[in-house]
Amino acid sequence: MFCRFSGCNLWNGREHGRKDAICRFCDTDFVGTDGDGGGVFASADILVDAVAATWQGASHPRAARFVVCTGGEPLLQLDAPLVEGLHAAGFEVAVETNGTRSTVPGLDWVCVSPKGGTDLAITSGNELKLVIPQDGVDPARFESLGFDRLWLQPMDGPDVEQNTALAVRYCLENPQWRLSIQTHKHIGIR
Protein backbone atom coordinates (compact mmCIF):
# COMPACT_ATOMS: atom_id res chain seq x y z
CA MET A 1 0.00 0.00 0.00
CA PHE A 2 1.20 3.54 -0.73
CA CYS A 3 0.76 6.43 1.69
CA ARG A 4 1.47 9.52 -0.42
CA PHE A 5 2.64 12.68 1.34
CA SER A 6 2.21 16.12 -0.18
CA GLY A 7 4.98 18.64 -0.66
CA CYS A 8 8.51 18.32 -1.99
CA ASN A 9 11.73 20.22 -1.44
CA LEU A 10 12.73 19.84 -5.12
CA TRP A 11 9.55 21.12 -6.85
CA ASN A 12 6.40 22.89 -5.71
CA GLY A 13 4.19 20.45 -7.61
CA ARG A 14 2.64 23.08 -9.84
CA GLU A 15 3.28 23.27 -13.58
CA HIS A 16 4.19 26.97 -13.44
CA GLY A 17 7.05 26.06 -11.08
CA ARG A 18 8.44 23.15 -13.10
CA LYS A 19 10.89 25.17 -15.23
CA ASP A 20 12.65 26.51 -12.11
CA ALA A 21 12.54 23.25 -10.14
CA ILE A 22 15.52 21.10 -9.24
CA CYS A 23 13.48 18.04 -10.25
CA ARG A 24 11.63 18.88 -13.47
CA PHE A 25 10.45 15.41 -14.45
CA CYS A 26 8.23 14.45 -11.52
CA ASP A 27 5.22 12.44 -12.68
CA THR A 28 3.33 12.47 -9.37
CA ASP A 29 0.41 14.67 -8.32
CA PHE A 30 1.46 15.24 -4.73
CA VAL A 31 -0.27 18.61 -4.38
CA GLY A 32 -3.93 17.64 -4.58
CA THR A 33 -5.64 14.64 -3.13
CA ASP A 34 -9.03 13.06 -3.38
CA GLY A 35 -8.87 11.43 0.06
CA ASP A 36 -11.20 12.09 2.98
CA GLY A 37 -10.60 15.53 4.48
CA GLY A 38 -8.35 16.43 1.56
CA GLY A 39 -5.72 14.05 2.86
CA VAL A 40 -5.01 16.15 5.97
CA PHE A 41 -4.76 14.26 9.26
CA ALA A 42 -4.70 15.95 12.66
CA SER A 43 -2.38 13.39 14.24
CA ALA A 44 -0.22 10.37 13.53
CA ASP A 45 -2.81 8.14 15.23
CA ILE A 46 -5.59 9.32 12.91
CA LEU A 47 -3.40 8.68 9.86
CA VAL A 48 -2.50 5.21 11.17
CA ASP A 49 -6.21 4.46 11.59
CA ALA A 50 -6.87 5.61 8.01
CA VAL A 51 -4.06 3.43 6.64
CA ALA A 52 -5.30 0.42 8.62
CA ALA A 53 -8.89 0.98 7.44
CA THR A 54 -7.73 1.19 3.82
CA TRP A 55 -5.69 -2.04 4.01
CA GLN A 56 -7.49 -4.77 2.10
CA GLY A 57 -5.00 -7.56 2.60
CA ALA A 58 -6.24 -10.90 3.81
CA SER A 59 -5.31 -12.34 7.17
CA HIS A 60 -3.22 -15.12 5.62
CA PRO A 61 -0.04 -15.73 7.65
CA ARG A 62 2.10 -14.77 4.64
CA ALA A 63 0.13 -11.60 3.86
CA ALA A 64 2.44 -8.92 5.22
CA ARG A 65 0.94 -5.55 6.09
CA PHE A 66 3.33 -3.26 4.23
CA VAL A 67 3.05 0.48 3.64
CA VAL A 68 5.35 2.58 1.46
CA CYS A 69 5.55 6.22 2.49
CA THR A 70 6.13 8.20 -0.68
CA GLY A 71 5.48 11.67 -2.02
CA GLY A 72 6.35 14.33 -2.93
CA GLU A 73 9.06 14.00 -0.34
CA PRO A 74 7.79 11.97 2.63
CA LEU A 75 10.69 12.84 4.92
CA LEU A 76 9.40 16.41 5.13
CA GLN A 77 6.59 15.00 7.33
CA LEU A 78 7.24 11.36 8.24
CA ASP A 79 8.36 11.13 11.86
CA ALA A 80 9.08 8.55 14.56
CA PRO A 81 5.56 8.66 16.13
CA LEU A 82 3.99 7.80 12.76
CA VAL A 83 6.47 4.97 12.12
CA GLU A 84 5.88 3.64 15.64
CA GLY A 85 2.11 3.87 15.18
CA LEU A 86 2.23 1.99 11.89
CA HIS A 87 4.39 -0.69 13.51
CA ALA A 88 1.92 -0.96 16.40
CA ALA A 89 -0.85 -1.49 13.81
CA GLY A 90 1.14 -4.39 12.38
CA PHE A 91 2.67 -2.68 9.34
CA GLU A 92 6.17 -2.89 7.99
CA VAL A 93 7.15 0.64 6.99
CA ALA A 94 9.13 1.62 3.91
CA VAL A 95 10.05 5.03 2.58
CA GLU A 96 10.80 6.13 -0.97
CA THR A 97 12.68 9.40 -0.76
CA ASN A 98 14.83 11.68 -2.89
CA GLY A 99 17.50 11.17 -0.23
CA THR A 100 18.15 14.84 0.54
CA ARG A 101 16.82 14.62 4.12
CA SER A 102 17.88 12.27 6.91
CA THR A 103 15.75 9.22 7.65
CA VAL A 104 13.72 8.71 10.79
CA PRO A 105 14.29 5.83 13.24
CA GLY A 106 12.51 2.53 12.84
CA LEU A 107 12.08 2.28 9.07
CA ASP A 108 12.07 -1.28 7.77
CA TRP A 109 13.02 -0.42 4.18
CA VAL A 110 14.74 2.62 2.66
CA CYS A 111 14.65 3.36 -1.06
CA VAL A 112 16.50 6.45 -2.27
CA SER A 113 15.71 7.88 -5.70
CA PRO A 114 18.36 10.57 -6.24
CA LYS A 115 17.81 13.57 -8.45
CA GLY A 116 20.46 15.41 -10.43
CA GLY A 117 21.70 18.62 -8.85
CA THR A 118 21.19 17.43 -5.27
CA ASP A 119 23.42 16.16 -2.49
CA LEU A 120 22.43 12.98 -0.70
CA ALA A 121 21.92 12.99 3.06
CA ILE A 122 21.18 9.25 2.87
CA THR A 123 24.04 7.21 1.44
CA SER A 124 23.01 3.72 2.48
CA GLY A 125 19.83 1.70 2.51
CA ASN A 126 18.01 -1.21 0.95
CA GLU A 127 17.87 0.16 -2.56
CA LEU A 128 18.81 3.06 -4.75
CA LYS A 129 16.48 3.66 -7.69
CA LEU A 130 17.84 6.03 -10.31
CA VAL A 131 15.53 7.45 -12.97
CA ILE A 132 17.42 7.82 -16.26
CA PRO A 133 18.34 9.77 -18.21
CA GLN A 134 19.00 12.81 -16.04
CA ASP A 135 21.27 15.62 -17.21
CA GLY A 136 24.73 15.30 -15.72
CA VAL A 137 23.96 12.11 -13.77
CA ASP A 138 26.17 9.07 -14.26
CA PRO A 139 24.89 5.89 -12.57
CA ALA A 140 28.48 4.89 -11.74
CA ARG A 141 28.58 7.79 -9.25
CA PHE A 142 26.25 5.84 -6.95
CA GLU A 143 27.88 2.40 -7.11
CA SER A 144 30.23 2.94 -4.16
CA LEU A 145 27.41 3.96 -1.81
CA GLY A 146 26.03 1.53 0.77
CA PHE A 147 22.86 0.32 -0.94
CA ASP A 148 21.99 -3.37 -1.14
CA ARG A 149 20.42 -3.07 -4.60
CA LEU A 150 20.85 -0.68 -7.51
CA TRP A 151 17.90 -0.10 -9.86
CA LEU A 152 17.58 1.90 -13.09
CA GLN A 153 14.13 3.16 -14.00
CA PRO A 154 13.43 4.61 -17.44
CA MET A 155 12.07 8.15 -17.29
CA ASP A 156 8.41 8.29 -18.25
CA GLY A 157 7.07 10.68 -20.85
CA PRO A 158 7.27 11.05 -24.62
CA ASP A 159 10.71 9.36 -24.80
CA VAL A 160 9.83 6.36 -22.61
CA GLU A 161 10.67 3.80 -25.34
CA GLN A 162 14.10 5.35 -25.94
CA ASN A 163 14.69 5.68 -22.19
CA THR A 164 13.69 2.06 -21.62
CA ALA A 165 16.15 0.90 -24.29
CA LEU A 166 18.86 3.00 -22.61
CA ALA A 167 18.12 1.49 -19.19
CA VAL A 168 18.04 -2.08 -20.54
CA ARG A 169 21.33 -1.58 -22.39
CA TYR A 170 22.99 -0.05 -19.32
CA CYS A 171 21.83 -2.94 -17.10
CA LEU A 172 23.12 -5.51 -19.59
CA GLU A 173 26.50 -3.78 -19.75
CA ASN A 174 26.60 -3.14 -15.98
CA PRO A 175 24.97 -6.14 -14.26
CA GLN A 176 25.29 -4.60 -10.81
CA TRP A 177 22.23 -2.58 -11.90
CA ARG A 178 18.74 -4.04 -12.30
CA LEU A 179 15.84 -2.76 -14.37
CA SER A 180 12.87 -1.20 -12.58
CA ILE A 181 9.64 -0.43 -14.38
CA GLN A 182 6.54 1.26 -13.00
CA THR A 183 4.28 -1.78 -13.12
CA HIS A 184 1.30 0.13 -11.74
CA LYS A 185 1.32 2.36 -14.83
CA HIS A 186 1.49 -0.58 -17.22
CA ILE A 187 -1.50 -2.31 -15.63
CA GLY A 188 -3.55 0.82 -14.92
CA ILE A 189 -3.46 1.04 -11.13
CA ARG A 190 -3.84 4.55 -9.82
What are these regions (language model features)?
Residues 2-4, 25, 68, 111, ...:
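Conserved beta-strand segments that form the floor/walls of ligand-binding pockets within enzyme
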Residues 10-107:
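Conserved Radical SAM active-site core
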Residues 61-66, 74-190:
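Conserved AdoMet/S-adenosylmethionine-binding subsite of the radical SAM
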Residues 1-32, 173, 178, 182, ...:
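Flexible, acidic/Gly-rich N-terminal and inter-domain linker regions that tether
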